[in-house]
Amino acid sequence: MAMHDTIVIGASAGGVQALIRLIEDLTGDLPAAVFIVLHIPADAPSLLPEILGRQSLLPVAHADNNEEIRQGRIYVAPPDHHLLIERRHVRLVHGPKENLHRPSIDALFRSAARWAGPRTIGVVLTGARDDGTAGMRAIKQRGGITIVQDPFEAPFPSMPKSVMQDIRVDYSLSLSDIAPLLNMLSRQTAEEEGKYPVPENVEIEASIAQQEMESDELIASTDKLGKVSRLTCPDCHGALWEINDADLLRFRCHVGHAYSAESLKDGQEQMLEVALWSAVRALEEQMILAKRIIERARKANQSRAAKMFEKRVEQAEAHSSAIRQLLLGGAKGDIAKPHIQDREEMSIS
């Protein structure tokens, strides 16, 4: 009989301390493989394996592509790569971001649901936004066990709260109680996999993350997931499909970028900010050119032309000032409010 031998853990803001607290209580003879995704910057090395390794009775390391999965080990997603499970091997993929992240919690969880099914235990810890919610739904659909950190304890409760709003989780616990539960559950028999077939959407989305499809097949598969919306992808600017996933509002483009409603909103705000700064740059270049034309017009005694371009400079200055004020938070509809950054994770990278 199969046991619960696949434990997948996702964390974001506040996640370093949460992971340390959880990992230090896992037994040295844990009969399961543990996979961890922590949102970290893409452009810096991660010291998470070393930090966790100092507290863990289990060996901890960044995962290597195509290495065989072994029980009693902790695999950490390296920066800028999705950590995935494929049968009995680890896959590292530099694929499209999900929920603006690479590595993505959803991508790991979905791959575990696809290949490990009821043997999977999913754990969502502290974090901002809602990465992990769709992945936990996939684990639930496949008969796996779902655990979240108690939102009242989590320093950033958005991620565990989001999961609890979407599915009926099996356990909501304090950090001190999660590891003992994992030690126990990993020694219990999992349900029969045949009782929980892989849903078509989980199969398709896991295949997309694992880069198993050619372009034509990818577009056809995206059509199966939902209908084309009137929205565009913040990453590649292609069309977005609205995914049919019960009451969970999600989107995908045909390249493979995936978004929850919350992450799409954040992506749109980032895209808008880039566009507005581009507008400021264009207006300032327009002013520079107009001022050069004014200088030449005055030297040629072309006063009418000079006055016309002076008005253009005034208009461009007014527009540029208004946009700058909006970007810097000095106007209503402030878009310059910073998103919650994983400052703690950045400090260890």
PLM segments and residue spans:
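Conserved acid/base catalytic micro-environments in cytosolic active-site loops
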Residues: 1-295, 311-332, 346-348
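Short helix-adjacent coil turns
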Residues: 256, 297-304
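Composition-driven low-complexity segments enriched in polar/acidic and proline residues
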Residues: 333-345
